[in-house]
From Swiss-Prot:
Function: Necessary for efficient RNA polymerase transcription elongation past template-encoded arresting sites. The arresting sites in DNA have the property of trapping a certain fraction of elongating RNA polymerases that pass through, resulting in locked ternary complexes. Cleavage of the nascent transcript by cleavage factors such as GreA or GreB allows the resumption of elongation from the new 3'terminus. GreB releases sequences of up to 9 nucleotides in length.
GO molecular function, one term: RNA polymerase binding
PANTHER family: TRANSCRIPTION ELONGATION FACTOR GREA, TRANSCRIPTION ELONGATION FACTOR GREB
Keyword Transcription regulation appears in the UniProt entry: yes
Pfam families the record matches: GreA_GreB, GreA_GreB_N
Alphabetical UniProt keywords: DNA-binding, Transcription, Transcription regulation
Cross-referenced NCBIfam families: greB, PRK01885.1
GO biological process, one term: DNA-templated transcription elongation
Record-linked HAMAP family: GreA_GreB, GreB
Keyword flag Cell inner membrane: no
Name of the protein in its database record: Transcription elongation factor GreB
Length: 157
């Protein structure tokens, strides 16, 4: 189950997407559908069919964003988090082989399209929560346990 948390930046990004879809793209596509429908036979009208499909996709995304944003809890930075891994932290970790990773722990709705973001619900994030620099985090993976050491923790303030 996904945890309904989001960073302020993530919430603003979703809000901008919703505004763009509802105020700019949807009216434009609606005009195209109306124009294509006025041409007559809709069964062989590619413009009509494509734009009608796009309109359904926009409406689906708008419904999802509207419902999703009502339930999300914005988590802002707090000075009490400093020095430990919590939601919103940028974390650099290293394994026994010397491989390093750097990512930010964010909400489920923020991870798409970002390789450097992981969900708070992921096994890695769960293992890292409340750890400090130098601590060992044992992550359960499909092939067994993996050991990762926390090298750095940063917060966007």
């Amino acid at each position: 189950m996904k945890t309904p948390l989001i960073t302020r930046e993530g919430y603003e990004t979703l809000k901008q997407e919703l505004n763009y879809l509802w105020r700019e793209e949807r009216p434009e596509v609606t005009k195209k559908v109306t124009w294509a429908a006025s041409l007559g036979d809709r069964s062989e009208n590619a413009d009509y069919q494509y734009n009608k499909k796009r309109l359904r996709e926009i409406d689906r995304r708008v419904r999802y964003l509207t419902k999703c944003m009502e339930n999300l809890k914005i988590v802002d930075y707090s000075p009490q988090q400093e020095g430990k891994v919590f939601f919103g932290a940028w974390v650099e970790i290293e394994n026994d082989d010397g491989d390093t990773l750097k990512f930010r722990i964010v909400g489920y709705d923020e991870i798409f399209g970002r390789k450097d973001y992981i969900s708070i619900d992921s096994p890695m994030a769960r293992a890292l929560l409340k750890k400090e620099v130098g601590d060992l985090a044992v992550v359960n993976t499909p092939v067994g346990e993996a050991n990762w050491y926390v090298n750095a923790i940063e917060y966007v303030k």
